[in-house]
């Protein structure tokens, strides 16, 4: 019987080795597998290479992993934001390596790994520092740069629902990099809001087939923290 579910986030990230390359889904906070990241921090793996769209927000999620000094190198598109103080401090101190990749190239390099493509030519980045050391070619009068696929040992992603076979459905913008990362990693670990019985997922709605998923853990959404406003406080 195929059953890819595990009981806890700790069990989901068990066995991740020091020095692993890990893709982490999310576009900012949308689709960020925060509970899996917290479990990874507790698990203790170090010297990691992280692939993500950015380099963390505030001091939670990916930023918490950076702050715990578990990351040696990060591959991303938007490392600096108004609340990227953890990344900024580590990078300026020389404690974190950065490979900057244009967002479209990042998505396609990940997709190429999952599709078995050995590389692709793109005009994005030609003539800039991002193209230094890479093969270039002129095709039909236009200049291109050869980009290589990005493979990973693990992918940590977030989905809305799954069944025990690992079939996934995402919620709106939380989908982002999840599907391509799932196909590009040797081991894909997914946190979901709800695990449903086989047959409950509409086959036409499944985005990531279970063949790309290794482990699934159900994580109930946290209750929102709402502070009473001034008007509410006045009437207490």
Tell where the protein language model's regions lie, with residue ranges.
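Conserved alpha/beta enzyme-core scaffold
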Residues: 1-236
């Amino acid at each position: 019987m195929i059953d890819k579910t595990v009981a806890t986030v700790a069990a989901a990230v068990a066995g991740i080795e020091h020095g692993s390359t890990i893709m982490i889904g999310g576009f900012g906070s949308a689709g960020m597998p925060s509970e899996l990241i917290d479990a990874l921090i507790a698990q203790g793996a170090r010297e990691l290479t992280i692939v993500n769209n950015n380099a963390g927000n505030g001091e939670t999620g990916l930023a918490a992993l950076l702050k715990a000094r578990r990351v040696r190198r990060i591959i991303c598109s938007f490392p600096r934001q108004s609340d990227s103080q953890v990344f900024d401090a580590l990078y300026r101190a020389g404690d974190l390596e950065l490979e900057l990749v244009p967002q479209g190239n990042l998505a396609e390099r990940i997709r190429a790994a999952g599709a078995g493509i050995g590389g692709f030519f793109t005009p994005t980045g030609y003539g800039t520092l991002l193209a230094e050391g890479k093969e270039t070619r002129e095709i039909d009068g236009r200049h291109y740069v050869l980009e290589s696929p990005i493979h990973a040992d693990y992918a940590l992603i977030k989905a809305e629902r799954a069944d025990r076979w690992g079939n996934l459905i995402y919620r709106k913008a939380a989908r982002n990099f999840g599907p391509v990362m799932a196909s590009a990693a040797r081991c894909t670990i997914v946190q979901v809001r709800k695990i449903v019985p086989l047959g409950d997922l509409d086959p036409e709605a499944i985005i990531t087939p279970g063949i790309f998923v290794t482990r699934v853990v159900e994580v109930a959404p946290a209750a929102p923290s709402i502070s009473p406003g001034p008007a509410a406080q006045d009437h207490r």
